[in-house]
Amino acid sequence: MTVSSPFPRIPDPGVPVLVAFSGGLDSTVLLHCLASQPTQRIHGLEAIHIHHGLNENADAWTAHCAAFCTQHDIRLHIARVHVSHNSGQGLEAAARTARRAAFAHTLQHGHYLALAHHCDDQAETWLLRALRGSCDGLAAMRPLTPFAAGHLWRPLLTHSRAQLLDYAQQQHLDWIEDSSNADLRHDRNFLRIHVLPLLHQRWPQATAVLARNAALAAANADLLNAEDAVLLPDLLDPDGALDINALTAHPPARRARLLRAWCARAGAPPLPERGVNIIERELLPARHDSAACFTWSHTEIRRWRLRLYLHRPQPPWPPDWQPLWSGTAPLILPDGGQLHLESTDHETVPGFPHPLRVRARRGGERLILPGRTHSHPLKHLLQDVGIPPWRRASMPLLCDGEQILAVGDALLAAPLVTWLQAHRLKLRWQYHNNTCI
């Protein structure tokens, strides 16, 4: 990159940009380039610096970034984050999680978060993903992706670090050198310091070729993702569960993609390769009444009645939680779900004749359904209506004294049905998204 070389244009001219500014070479060049564009200044240019508190120089780095932004008349957001040392994901990953959360909190709706990843970073990412056996991961970093309320933009992926260094020297820029970038305990540093220089000795264009491979992999992934998006809806029931017979009609490679797409669509953590293997080996061929399960990252995939369900386990409801509910306003449940009455003619909800008790199941409850004279165990009734076992524990019971009037909105006793029909109302139970994704 030279002073006169063209800088990648923002995909949507006129949209404000927030630059992730660490004070290092890459982000300094990116912020300076954008600040040199009068039109971008008019439409909005700000920076954000993350103070991780992990390095003894963190305060000095923050001061450096503040001085740079003051000199160039750029508003700077300083986000001090707490990085957990006991998250179970490693310090580097925990710092990345905290950093992304700060970015998401600051980025405004529709705005762009600009990151200074360059061609060399892309090559390192491609090698790391290849060494980890990640097929879709070979697409590495995308130039533009949705992020939080806006978009994540990487305008420097076609520029090498050498070009950025030339630019910085021509502009007489000062930047921070982070000593942790020389720590060989980190895989990325090892690749940058030892592996890539050897590749360049033999193949001078190695970095550009690896980055081009990432772009080709991204194009192929986009095609496959589009196919997955067409196929997946036909495999889902109204609750979002995956039909096993429909899934197994596809070959194994496509099944793996559909399982991952299903998890991603539901907002679940990425499904690891181990999970795909366990699902293929244990869940898909299990018996009809099997309760087979795969657990990862506080998330479960359970098999039940020829369906696969995504589920996030929740703690049991407090045993003393037994509020009285009038029905005039929604009742928020301990797991974040709710009970409410819905008017079928859009009139004001009148509420019950007297407040009713709401509580969790304790076991052994029985219910008399409309048209029947004898009570039946809730366990059997819930099985009959197809409620998965793990969801039953979070179903609220609506009681009038000792009489059970409703179990969620799946089972209603005759007196409640009569009253609801007379008042043109429906009882609705909305379970929380974290309970069943």
Swiss-Prot record:
<keyword id="KW-0067">ATP-binding</keyword>
<dbReference type="InterPro" id="IPR012094">
    <property type="entry name" value="tRNA_Ile_lys_synt"/>
</dbReference>
<dbReference type="Pfam" id="PF09179">
    <property type="entry name" value="TilS"/>
</dbReference>
<comment type="function">
    <text>Ligates lysine onto the cytidine present at position 34 of the AUA codon-specific tRNA(Ile) that contains the anticodon CAU, in an ATP-dependent manner. Cytidine is converted to lysidine, thus changing the amino acid specificity of the tRNA from methionine to isoleucine.</text>
</comment>
<dbReference type="GO" id="GO:0006400">
    <property type="term" value="P:tRNA modification"/>
</dbReference>
<keyword id="KW-0819">tRNA processing</keyword>
<dbReference type="GO" id="GO:0032267">
    <property type="term" value="F:tRNA(Ile)-lysidine synthase activity"/>
</dbReference>
<comment type="similarity">
    <text>Belongs to the tRNA(Ile)-lysidine synthase family.</text>
</comment>
<keyword id="KW-0963">Cytoplasm</keyword>
<dbReference type="InterPro" id="IPR012796">
    <property type="entry name" value="Lysidine-tRNA-synth_C"/>
</dbReference>
<protein>
    <recommendedName>
        <fullName>tRNA(Ile)-lysidine synthase</fullName>
        <ecNumber>6.3.4.19</ecNumber>
    </recommendedName>
</protein>
<feature type="binding site">
    <location>
        <begin position="22"/>
        <end position="27"/>
    </location>
    <ligand>
        <name>ATP</name>
    </ligand>
</feature>
<keyword id="KW-0547">Nucleotide-binding</keyword>
<dbReference type="GO" id="GO:0005524">
    <property type="term" value="F:ATP binding"/>
</dbReference>
<dbReference type="GO" id="GO:0005737">
    <property type="term" value="C:cytoplasm"/>
</dbReference>
<keyword id="KW-0436">Ligase</keyword>
<dbReference type="InterPro" id="IPR015262">
    <property type="entry name" value="tRNA_Ile_lys_synt_subst-bd"/>
</dbReference>
<dbReference type="InterPro" id="IPR011063">
    <property type="entry name" value="TilS/TtcA_N"/>
</dbReference>
<dbReference type="Pfam" id="PF11734">
    <property type="entry name" value="TilS_C"/>
</dbReference>
<dbReference type="InterPro" id="IPR012795">
    <property type="entry name" value="tRNA_Ile_lys_synt_N"/>
</dbReference>
<dbReference type="Pfam" id="PF01171">
    <property type="entry name" value="ATP_bind_3"/>
</dbReference>
<dbReference type="InterPro" id="IPR014729">
    <property type="entry name" value="Rossmann-like_a/b/a_fold"/>
</dbReference>
